[in-house]
C-alpha cells in the first residue's frame, strides 16, 4: 500500500493511525521516499510517500529502506519507536544521532517555543503603517505594522521582553539539502507578531537571544528539528528533540559535534540534508 508519509510525525487527524502503526510489530518492511518525485516523477506530495509490508506472522523490528536521489539506504532493521519518542524517525542515519542526544537527558526547546498564533493575531492581521505613542511594533506577513497594546489579545507579558521570532512555515520543497527552518530574528521589547511567526523565549537580554540564534543556525540543531518535520509547517512540535543548551555563549556545529560525539559519517549525513543558514535577519531589514 502506497500512502503519504505525513503519518510518520504529523498530519491532522493522524494521531490514532500513527500510534496504531508504530506499535504494530507485524510491520515487516517500510520503503520511504522523503521526496515523492523519487517514486513518481513530477509529482509533489508534501512530506513524501511510503509503502510497507504487513506480515501477520512477523513479530519484531522493521526493515527500513530510504529512497533518495536515486539511491537506496538500508535495510536497517530497527524498532519503529525509539525510547522517549512518539513518532517515527524516518532517516536510518538519524537514529544514532537521536540516541546520542537523549543520553544526555537534557530539557528540550519545545518548553520555550510558543504555540501557533502566539499573540492571538491571525495571519490576516494588518495594523497601522505609522506608529503612535505607546504602540507595539508587530511583525506580520507583509512586513511591519503598529497596534495599540489593547489590540493584542494574548501573551501581552511577552511584549516587553526579549524573544526570538521565527517563521511558522519554511520552504515547501522536499528536495535536500534543505534549510528546515526559516531565519530567526530578535524581537526586542515593544514587539509582537502575527500568526506568521512563532515565538522562542523569553530571554534575559539581547546577548542571550543572539546566542540562541547561533544555535538555530547550526546544521546539528536543524537536523534534530528535521526528525519531526513532514510538512512545511514548523510548529512547536519540531523542537521536541532539540536540547536546550547553555546560552551564556554562542554555539557552532563543531562544538555540538564534539559534545554529542557525532562521527564523520553522521556529519556527512547532516551536510547532505541541511543547508547553511546565512544572510541578513528580517529585524535588520526593518530597522
How does the language model describe each region?
Residues 4, 57, 272:
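Surface loops and adjacent helix of pleckstrin homology
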Residues 268-287:
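Short, amphipathic C-terminal "tail helix"
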Residues 1-38, 50-52, 212:
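Conserved Class I SAM-dependent methyltransferase catalytic core
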Residues 37-266:
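C-terminal substrate-recognition regions of SAM-dependent nucleic acid methyltransferases
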Residues 8-9, 172-175, 277:
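Flexible loop/turn segments at secondary-structure boundaries
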Amino acid at each position: 500500500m502506497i500512502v503519504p508519509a505525513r503519518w510518520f510525525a504529523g498530519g491532522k487527524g493522524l494521531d490514532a493511525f500513527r500510534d496504531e502503526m508504530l506499535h504494530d510489530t507485524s510491520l515487516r518492511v517500510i520503503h520511504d521516499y522523503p521526496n515523492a518525485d523519487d517514486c513518481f516523477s513530477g509529482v509533489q506530495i508534501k512530506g513524501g510517500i511510503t509503502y510497507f509490508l504487513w506480515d501477520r506472522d512477523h513479530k519484531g523490528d522493521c526493515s527500513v529502506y530510504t529512497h533518495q536521489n536515486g539511491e537506496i539506504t538500508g535495510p536497517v532493521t530497527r524498532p519503529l519507536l525509539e525510547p522517549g519518542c512518539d513518532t517515527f524517525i524516518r532517516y536510518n542515519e538519524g537514529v544514532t544521532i537521536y540516541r546520542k542526544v537523549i543520553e544526555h537527558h537534557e530539557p528540550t526547546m519545545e518548553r520555550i517555543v510558543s504555540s501557533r498564533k502566539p499573540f492571538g493575531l491571525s495571519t490576516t492581521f494588518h495594523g497601522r503603517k505609522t506608529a503612535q505613542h505607546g504602540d507595539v511594533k508587530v511583525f506580520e506577513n507583509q512586513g511591519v505594522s503598529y497596534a495599540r497594546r489593547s489590540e493584542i489579545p494574548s501573551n501581552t507579558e511577552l511584549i516587553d521582553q526579549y524573544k526570538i521570532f521565527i517563521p511558522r512555515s519554511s520552504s515547501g520543497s522536499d528536495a535536500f539539502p534543505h534549510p528546515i527552518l526559516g531565519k530567526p530574528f530578535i524581537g526586542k521589547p515593544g514587539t509582537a507578531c502575527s500568526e506568521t511567526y512563532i515565538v522562542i523565549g523569553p530571554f534575559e537580554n539581547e546577548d542571550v537571544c543572539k546566542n540562541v540564534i547561533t544555535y538555530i543556525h547550526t546544521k546539528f540543531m536543524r537536523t534534530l528539528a528535521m526528525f519531526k518535520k513532514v510538512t512545511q509547517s514548523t510548529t512547536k512540535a519540531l523542537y521536541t528533540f532539540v536540547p536546550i543548551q547553555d546560552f551564556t555563549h554562542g554555539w557552532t556545529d563543531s562544538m555540538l559535534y564534539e559534545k554529542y560525539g557525532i562521527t564523520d559519517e553522521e556529519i556527512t549525513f547532516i551536510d547532505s540534508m541541511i543547508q547553511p543558514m546565512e544572510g541578513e535577519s528580517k529585524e535588520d531589514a526593518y530597522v
